[in-house]
């Protein structure tokens, strides 16, 4: 193994290797969470007409006292005649105001009679929504790289779009190596364990916006590794292999990747857990495949995926690779490692001075249950002694609303 590189350098190499994927049109009903491939410029005004903000009566300029009610304007069924002095038109919220409308008076402020209405003095412009006051034609309503949230989908629909031009979602193959791995739901042989990495990593792929192309367990065999990895490289945009990347006699993943033409970018990161992480690229005629060799220990696999593969999957879609980060105050001291930065599983809570991070307890890389209580990974820089309580540290969020914040109003 070469000299381990810092986390920031490893991420830089990963992100600099990325070629954005091609774009496709996605119906709005299927576009939640997708990433825009281009700016969206509105061709329409929103709202498309001057309308009423209240149920009431549309009034001409200077109207007060007794007015003749000459008609009604309903949402979707506008009154088409212009307002004249001494008249009013009953109007519903959201309905277009007739030509000549100066204001709308709410229904609760008037006295109605037979065909007439008594109205108080009403200032011009009252309760009238102007055409284009939300969006003007030519406005950029969403930028390339925006992730489509429910409000964003609503905005697209409001400007008349039925689909969005989005970057294609990356296809991600997940392989787990080891003779001991057994599919969950089957009986364990002596010395075997149920394979947890494929399903855990698949969940991280989906959370990053990718599509799981396959999950597969592979025995500790050089030929089997070459075949499985070769098949994955042929069909996926990203290949993640857990296990087999260290220096043991049964670690065949690095050799298989190199034999298949994958160009190594780095092997070894100054990180705990996750030191043996491997990354490389394979260039084909019309595409580039990213290949990650992740440690086999379950926590190490999830941590290194979060730090390196997840930003890559986001960047392939044109999304901000570093969006899910924050700064927090350590609530208790953490011993530093002299040669490696540490990704410490932590629980986040909110306080007046910002987020606070408290380690979840034992940090062994095989203890997957330790991830259950974690909202984030606090990055503790290498050095002597300890990171004291009160120190501000960078935190990689693990997804969703941190549990310590979920009860906030």
Model-derived features: positions:
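Short, low-complexity N-terminal leaders and the immediately following helix N-cap/first helix
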Residues: 1-68, 319-343, 407-409
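Helix-rich terminal scaffold detector
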Residues: 1-7, 162-294, 298-304, 315, ...
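Short, glycine/charged-enriched hinge/interface segments at domain edges or termini
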Residues: 2, 7-8, 13, 58-219, ...
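Structural signal for hydrophobic packing residues in well-ordered secondary-structure cores
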Residues: 15-22, 39, 97, 139, ...
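Flexible glycine/proline-rich
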Residues: 24-29, 37-38, 135, 256-409
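Short beta-strand/loop turn elements enriched in aromatics
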Residues: 26-28, 43-68, 100-114, 316, ...
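Short, hydrophobic/aliphatic alpha-helical segments
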Residues: 32-45, 78-90, 136, 279-280, ...
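Short, conserved secondary-structure segments in the cores of folded domains
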Residues: 36, 48-49, 79, 87, ...
């Amino acid at each position: 193994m070469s000299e381990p590189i810092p986390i920031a350098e490893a991420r830089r190499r990963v992100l600099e290797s990325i070629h954005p994927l091609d774009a496709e049109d996605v119906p709005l009903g299927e576009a939640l969470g997708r990433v825009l491939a281009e700016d969206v410029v509105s061709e329409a005004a929103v709202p498309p007409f001057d309308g009423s903000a209240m149920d009431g009566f549309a009034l001409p300029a200077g109207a007060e006292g007794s007015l003749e009610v000459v008609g009604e304007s309903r949402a979707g069924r506008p009154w088409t005649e212009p307002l004249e002095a001494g008249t009013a038109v009953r109007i519903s919220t959201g309905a277009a105001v007739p030509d000549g409308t100066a204001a709308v008076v709410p229904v609760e402020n008037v006295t109605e009679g037979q065909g007439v209405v008594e109205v108080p003095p009403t200032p011009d412009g009252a309760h009238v929504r102007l055409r284009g006051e939300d969006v003007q034609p030519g406005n950029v309503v969403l930028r390339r790289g925006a992730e489509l949230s429910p409000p964003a989908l609503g905005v697209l629909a409001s400007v008349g779009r039925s689909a969005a031009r989005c970057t294609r979602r990356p296809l991600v193959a997940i392989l787990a190596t080891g003779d001991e791995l057994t599919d969950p739901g089957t009986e364990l042989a002596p010395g075997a364990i149920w394979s947890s990495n494929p399903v855990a990593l698949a969940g991280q792929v989906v959370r990053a916006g990718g599509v799981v192309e396959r999950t597969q367990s592979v025995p500790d065999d050089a030929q089997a590794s070459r075949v499985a990895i070769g098949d994955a490289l042929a069909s996926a945009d990203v290949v993640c292999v857990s296990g087999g990347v260290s220096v043991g006699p049964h670690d065949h993943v690095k050799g298989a990747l190199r034999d298949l033409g994958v160009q190594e970018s780095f092997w070894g990161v100054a990180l705990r857990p996750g030191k043996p992480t491997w990354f490389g690229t394979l260039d084909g005629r019309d595409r580039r495949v990213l290949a990650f060799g992740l440690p086999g220990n379950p926590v190490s696999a999830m941590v290194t995926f979060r730090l390196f593969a997840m930003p890559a999957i986001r960047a392939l879609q044109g999304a901000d690779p570093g969006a899910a980060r924050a700064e927090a105050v350590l609530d208790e001291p953490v011993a530093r490692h002299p040669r490696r930065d540490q990704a410490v599983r932590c629980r986040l809570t909110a306080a007046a001075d910002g987020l606070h991070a408290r380690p979840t307890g034992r940090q062994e890389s095989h203890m997957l249950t330790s991830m259950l209580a974690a909202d984030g990974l606090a990055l503790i820089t290498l050095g002597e002694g300890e990171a004291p309580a009160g120190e501000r540290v960078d935190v990689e969020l693990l997804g969703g609303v941190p549990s310590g914040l979920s009860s906030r109003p």
